[in-house]
UniProtKB/Swiss-Prot annotation:
A biological process term (GO) from this entry: sporulation resulting in formation of a cellular spore
Signal peptide residue numbers: 1-23
Residue stretches in coiled coil: 379-416, 513-561
Keywords: Coiled coil, Mitochondrion, Ribonucleoprotein, Signal, Sporulation
Subcellular location: Mitochondrion
Annotated spans, Disordered: 525-577
Classification of source organism: Eukaryota, Fungi, Dikarya, Ascomycota, Saccharomycotina
Biased composition (Low complexity): 562-577
GO cellular component: mitochondrion; ribonucleoprotein complex
Compositionally biased spans, kind Basic and acidic residues: 525-545
Protein family (similarity comment): Belongs to the SHE10 family.
UniProt function note: Involved in spore wall assembly. May be a component of the mitochondrial RNase MRP (MtMRP), a ribonucleoprotein endoribonuclease involved in the cleaving RNA transcripts to generate primers for DNA replication in mitochondria.
Protein name: Outer spore wall assembly protein SHE10
Organism: Saccharomyces cerevisiae (strain JAY291) (Baker's yeast)
C-alpha cells in the first residue's frame, strides 16, 4: 500500500510539473506529441469529457472540480507565477550567467587526460569480470523469448522517458536561451568564423531511437494518427593535428594547448601499458572462467539429478507398491487353493453330478483342486512377477541412460557457452591489439630506438595473445572431458536393484513355502484317499464274503430240505406196505 501511495504521489507531481510547463510555454510548443501529451494530461480536459458523457460525474463531481479550479486560478496560480518570476530573476538567470562565463574559460583537456586512463582501466576490469561472472548466468536465464519481451518493455519505457526528457530539455533550453542566449553559437562561433583550412570537420547522424507512431483518441473517440517522427543526434567532430591545434590554441592559453597535443601521445602510451597489464589479468580471467563454468556445470547436473531422482523415486515407489499388491493377490489365490485341497465330495440332487465343498462342508468351491491346477497357479505367479521385475530393471537402465544423455547435453551446452565467450574474448583482444598496432604505426615516434621498442612490445603482446588463445582451447578441452558426479545415480540404481533382488528372493522363498505346503496337503489328501479306497476295498471284500456265505448257507438249507422230504416219502411207503 505504501508503494502504491508513493507511485500515485510521484505521478501526481510529474503531471503537475508537466501541466505547469505546458501552461508556461503554451505559445512556444511546436512538437505535436508534446501538445498531445499536454492536452491529455490536463485535468480540465478530462473534466469536460466526463461531464459531457456521465450524468453522475456532472452532478456530483464537476461542481466541486469547478470550485477547486477557480480557487486555484485566483489564489494559487498567481502566487506560483510570481514566485517563478522571482526565482528566475534572482537565482536562475545569475546562475546561468556565472556558469556560462566559467564555461568560456574552463578547458577540460587536462582533466580528461588525467581521468581517462584510470577510467579505461576500471572499465576493462569490470568488463572482464562481467564476462567471467555475470554474462554466463544472464545468457543462461535470459532466453530469447524473455529477451524479446524485455526489449519490448525497455523500448516502451524508453519512449515514455524520451517524451519526458524532451519536454524537460526543451523547457531548460528555452530558459537558458532566454537568459544568456544561444551559448552553443557563442562558444563555437570564434572557431567556425576563422579560416577553416586548418580544421577538418565531419558531421555524422546517428539515430538515437527508432521511428515511432503514436495513435491517440480525441474527445469524440475518433482516432488520429500523428506524423511519424524520428529523433536523431547530430555529432560534430573536429579533428586537429599539432599544427592546426596551434592555430586554434591562439584563443586559449599556450600551455593548455600543448597539454592537449601531448595528451594524444600519452593515450597511446597508456594503451600499450594497459594492454601489457591486462594480459596478466586475462590468464587469471580464463582460469576463473573455467572454474566458474565447471561449477555451473556441476550445479546444473546436481539440480537435474536431484529433480530426476525424486521424480523416479516416486515412480518406482508406485511400481513396487503395484508389484507388492499383485504378488499378494497371486499368493492369496494359491493359499486359497491349498486350503481347498482338503475338500469334501458331494452329489448334486438335481443333476446328479459331483460337487465339491471346502473342508468344513459349508462352502461350495468352483472346481476340484488338482496338482496340475496348483502347478499352473505357481507358474503363472512366477512368470508374472519375473516380467514385472524385468520391466523395472529395464526402466532403471533406461533412466540411467537418459540421465547420462542429459548430463552430456548440459556439458555440451556449457562448453558452447565457454566457446562463445572465448570467441568473443579472442575477437575483442585481436581487435584491440590491431587497433594499438595501427595507432602505433601512424602516430609512432620518429626515434628508431623507440620504434624498435614498440615493435618488440607488439611482438611480445602477440605472443601473449597466442598463449592466451591456446589456454582457452585447453580450458575448453578440459571442460569437454570433465566428468560429472553420478554417485547419487549409482546409489539410486543400486538401491532399486537391491530392492528388486530382495523382493525376488522373498517371493521365491514364499512360493517355496507354499509349494511345500501344497505338497503336504496333496500327500495328506492322497493318503486319505488311499485309506478310503482300502477301506472301501475291504468293505467290498467283506460284503462279497458275506454274500458268498449267504449263498453257501442257502445251498445247505436247500440240501437239508431235500433230505427231509425223501425220508418222509420212504417212511410213508413202508407204512403202506
Amino acid at each position: 500500500m505504501g508503494k502504491l501511495i508513493k507511485l500515485i504521489t510521484t505521478l501526481t507531481v510529474l503531471v503537475s510539473l508537466l501541466q505547469y510547463c505546458c501552461e508556461f510555454n503554451s505559445g512556444s510548443i511546436s512538437c505535436e506529441r508534446t501538445q498531445t501529451l499536454c492536452h491529455y494530461t490536463n485535468p480540465r480536459v478530462w473534466n469536460t469529457y466526463f461531464s459531457r458523457n456521465c450524468e453522475l460525474y456532472k452532478n456530483k463531481v464537476s461542481p466541486g472540480f469547478d470550485i477547486v479550479a477557480r480557487k486555484y486560478d485566483t489564489a494559487v496560480k498567481p502566487v506560483i507565477d510570481d514566485a517563478t518570476v522571482k526565482v528566475n530573476k534572482v537565482a536562475i538567470q545569475p546562475a546561468f550567467k556565472v556558469i556560462h562565463s566559467q564555461c568560456k574559460k574552463w578547458n577540460c583537456g587536462k582533466y580528461y587526460q588525467l581521468g581517462r586512463s584510470p577510467m579505461v582501466k576500471t572499465r576493462r576490469f569490470f568488463f572482464a569480470k562481467y564476462n567471467a561472472f555475470v554474462k554466463p548466468n544472464l545468457d543462461k536465464f535470459f532466453t530469447a523469448e524473455f529477451r524479446s519481451h524485455l526489449k519490448e518493455r525497455i523500448l516502451k519505457y524508453k519512449n515514455i522517458g524520451h517524451y519526458y526528457f524532451t519536454i524537460t530539455s526543451r523547457c531548460i533550453k528555452s530558459k537558458y536561451d532566454f537568459t544568456v542566449g544561444n551559448t552553443e553559437e557563442k562558444l563555437m562561433g570564434k572557431f567556425k568564423n576563422k579560416d577553416t583550412h586548418g580544421i577538418h570537420g565531419s558531421v555524422t547522424r546517428e539515430p538515437s531511437s527508432e521511428d515511432m507512431v503514436l495513435t491517440v483518441s480525441t474527445m469524440e473517440s475518433d482516432e488520429e494518427e500523428l506524423t511519424t517522427t524520428s529523433t536523431q543526434t547530430v555529432v560534430e567532430t573536429i579533428t586537429l593535428d599539432q599544427e592546426e591545434a596551434s592555430a586554434v590554441a591562439n584563443h586559449a592559453h599556450d600551455d593548455e594547448a600543448s597539454t592537449d597535443v601531448e595528451g594524444s601521445t600519452d593515450v597511446n602510451v597508456n594503451e600499450q601499458a594497459l594492454l601489457q597489464e591486462d594480459f596478466d589479468m586475462w590468464s587469471e580471467t580464463i582460469l576463473q572462467k573455467t572454474q566458474d563454468v565447471i561449477q555451473l556445470f556441476e550445479k546444473d547436473v546436481s539440480k537435474y539429478i536431484n529433480g530426476k531422482l525424486v521424480e523416479e523415486a516416486n515412480h518406482f515407489k508406485a511400481k513396487f507398491q503395484s508389484l507388492d499388491d499383485k504378488s499378494k493377490k497371486f499368493f492369496s489365490k494359491i493359499s486359497l487353493a491349498i486350503n481347498d485341497i482338503e475338500c469334501v465330495e458331494g452329489i448334486d440332487s438335481e443333476t446328479g453330478k459331483k460337487i465339491f465343498f471346502d473342508k468344513s462342508g459349508s462352502t461350495e468351491i468352483s472346481q476340484y483342486i488338482t496338482r496340475e491346477l496348483v502347478r499352473e497357479y505357481f507358474n503363472e505367479t512366477r512368470s508374472t512377477l519375473d516380467e514385472l521385475t524385468n520391466a523395472m530393471e529395464k526402466d532403471l537402465s533406461e533412466i540411467t541412460d537418459e540421465i547420462e544423455k542429459k548430463v552430456n547435453a548440459i556439458r555440451e551446452e556449457n562448453v558452447e557457452v565457454f566457446e562463445e565467450w572465448g570467441d568473443i574474448i579472442v575477437n575483442e583482444w585481436s581487435k584491440r591489439m590491431a587497433y594499438v598496432d595501427v595507432i602505433n604505426a601512424h602516430m609512432g615516434a620518429d626515434d628508431d630506438t623507440t620504434l624498435d621498442e614498440e615493435k618488440a612490445k607488439s611482438s611480445v603482446n602477440w605472443k601473449k595473445f597466442l598463449k592466451g588463445k591456446k589456454q582457452i582451447i585447453e580450458s575448453r578441452d578440459k571442460l569437454a572431458h570433465h566428468s560429472a558426479d553420478l554417485s547419487r545415480v549409482n546409489a539410486f540404481r543400486q538401491k532399486v536393484q537391491k530392492k528388486i533382488l530382495s523382493f525376488t528372493q522373498e517371493s521365491g522363498e514364499f512360493l517355496y513355502i507354499l509349494r511345500s505346503k501344497a505338497n503336504l496337503q496333496f500327500q495328506e489328501r492322497e493318503r486319505k484317499e488311499r485309506e478310503r479306497k482300502e477301506r472301501e476295498k475291504a468293505a467290498a471284500e467283506e460284503f462279497q464274503r458275506q454274500q458268498e456265505l449267504l449263498l453257501q448257507q442257502e445251498e445247505e438249507d436247500e440240501e437239508d430240505v431235500s433230505y427231509t422230504s425223501t425220508s418222509t416219502i420212504t417212511t410213508t411207503t413202508t407204512m403202506t406196505l
